[in-house]
Amino acid sequence: MRRFAILLLLALGACSVPQQTIRGVIITGQNNHNWPVSSEAIRLTLEQSGRFEIDLAVSPPAGAPMDSFRVDFSRYELVVLDYNGDPWPEEMRQAFLDYVDAGGGVIVYHAADNAFPDWEAYNRIIALGGWEGRDEHSGPYQYWQDGALVQDTTAGRGGSHGVRHPYVLTCRRGAEHPILKGLPVQWMHAEDELYDRMRGPGEIGDLLCTAWADPAQRGSGREEPLVFTVNYGKARIFHTMLGHAGPTLEDNPAMQCTGFQVLLLRAAEWCARGRVTQPVPADFPTAEAVSLRPGYRP
């Protein structure tokens, strides 16, 4: 009996040991979007889960010398890209590529897929991009049609979106991926931009979520890939086009959406560790109703 009690105490003690937090960095500081809001919303979402410790790497302002901008990627299991601005210095670019090539975890968030149209390796890391002069020379359009991901080499601009509105996301062939496992097949996302006509040279790994870009909302009339993983060497890369930042943290529906935050949290763990240990929360949105977490807290 005494031996059983000791074993039970040891087991309970093991269960109570806190999981080691994941160290991550958000690269930000220049963007055509409201980066002070987006970077803080991402930091709050990750840190308030208790699973992450997040630093901010803030670049010099647009037009200022970039020579001193550096990130020590060796300190991090996770890199979140929230940057669309001036080119990084060569040493920074090479350090990022070394991190990715070594199997690092990367989240490509929203307008980070607008950045660096002439950097070939970056465009393969993000798979799809838009704006900044992208066209048929940047790679094919990719969209979901008749149960398959289509690659369309038609000439035309890369990147557009209609008016911001709530829309339904559908989980596709990545439904059993650890990031999506247990989530509903369809769920309602809060008011947001819906990127369409994105194109690029990269290879989508698991297509996780698509949405219909409704022509009535000035969309493409296609089922657009908005959330996916990217095949690039040993790296674990998650690309989400969701999450247009609002004017303030308090008025930021696309990032206050529970679905956005849950995907971000699960993806961050997967990118860093290759697994997802988080349960599906009770407040996850349904196909009919948006769910919000205004304070960015589970």
Predicted regions and their residues:
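Bacterial Sec-dependent signal peptides at the C-terminal "C-region" and cleavage site
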Residues: L8, L12-R23
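Extracellular ligand-binding/catalytic regions of CAZymes and related secreted enzymes
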Residues: Q20-I22, Q48, P215-P298
